[in-house]
Structures are given as C-alpha cells and as structure tokens.
Amino acid sequence: MTRVALLTTGRELSQAAPPARARTPLPVPTPRGERPDDGGHAPHRDRRVNQRRRQVGDRRAQRGVDEHPWRRPDERPNDHLPQRNSERPEGVRGQRIRDAGDEALTDHRPQSAPFDLCIEAMGAIDTQQRLGVIPACAPAEKAGRVTKVSSSGPNSTPLPAARIGPGTNNAPSAADTTTYARGAIGPVATTIALRTPSTWMTRATATR
C-alpha cells in the first residue's frame, strides 16, 4: 500500500504545473530631459532645464577674512580702478576723465545778448534814416508842437516833444540840451520845448 501511494504521489507531482518564474518588468521609456543624470551630459531643448550651475571659485591664492570677494586688490579706496596706461590717461573726445564733482559742465543753451551791446531794431530802414538825412517837418507854430532831432548816431530819428502852454510855473532855470541817439547805451532823453510869454526854453527829461 505504501508503494502504491508513492507512485500515485509521483504521478500527481509530475502532472502538476511547473512553478511560475519571476518575470522582469519591461523598462518604461522616459524623456531624455527628465532623467536625473542627463543634466550635465545632454542639454535640454530649452537649454535651461536641469542645468547645473558652474561653481566659480576665488582665483586668487589667498583671501583675507575681512576682504570682500568682489573687491579687486588693485582697487583704490575711492572705488576707482587704476588707469590702464598711467602716462596717458583715458579720455573721451579728447577730454581727460575727471571726477564728476570737479567737472565743470558747459552750458550749450542759447544765451541772450550781453547788456553792453547795442541791438538795432528789426525791420526795413528808411533811405533817409540810412543816409542820416533829417526829414522836413512843419514849423512849430503851425504844427502845434516842437520837435528836436538828435543829430548823432546812425539811427537818428525825430523825437516828438509835448507842448506846454503859457502860464505854467514848471519852467526850468537852465536849458539842458543833452540828447542821445536811439539805441545807444544810457538814458534816453526826450527834449521838451517850454513856451513862455518871453522866450523859448528847452528841458531834457530822462526816462528809463
């Protein structure tokens, strides 16, 4: 009986299915840019993904504790670097570079004319005025006014004078005949004729 049982057990074992083997999983394809080790080898199309930053060290032999790494050893205390050629300093348009505080800025704006220059009036000049000819005028008795013309200067023109009737008490004690050419430097004097019952007297009044 024991022999029959063993034979039956052997047959069952031989007829039984073989044990299942462990299958290895197939590799899942992943994009090249997402792999952890591709940052330093294969650049991404964007050129900014998974890129390792370069470590830039101090190229100097020694650096003190209190010395900043961005400060050059040849930098001056005023934060100015030395000139590349000390015999011929750098320049812009032929001018030497100086400190901004010592540089005198040039004013290129249009300047007005100085006050000591005589500026002639714009416009057409009459031929008689250009030649200095005094135009004829009516007598004072008929025109009702007295006109005295300055005879000096290229722009000599008749200056009208006001008429003061007889009986006034503001007649000057002495006659002042000082006249100035129009456009000259100094006060412009207008000669006013004062008519009195006895004689004609002139007075110059200065205006600013």
Swiss-Prot record:
Low complexity bias locations: 16-25
Record flagged with keyword Signal: yes
Bias kind Polar residues: ranges: 148-158, 167-176
Name recorded for this polypeptide: Uncharacterized protein Rv2306c
Protein species of origin: Mycobacterium tuberculosis (strain ATCC 25618 / H37Rv)
Biased composition (Basic residues): 44-54
GO cellular component: plasma membrane
Stretches with biased composition (Basic and acidic residues): 32-43, 55-95
Origin superkingdom: Bacteria
Keywords associated with the record: Signal
Region span, Disordered: 1-95, 145-176
Annotated signal sequence range: 1-16
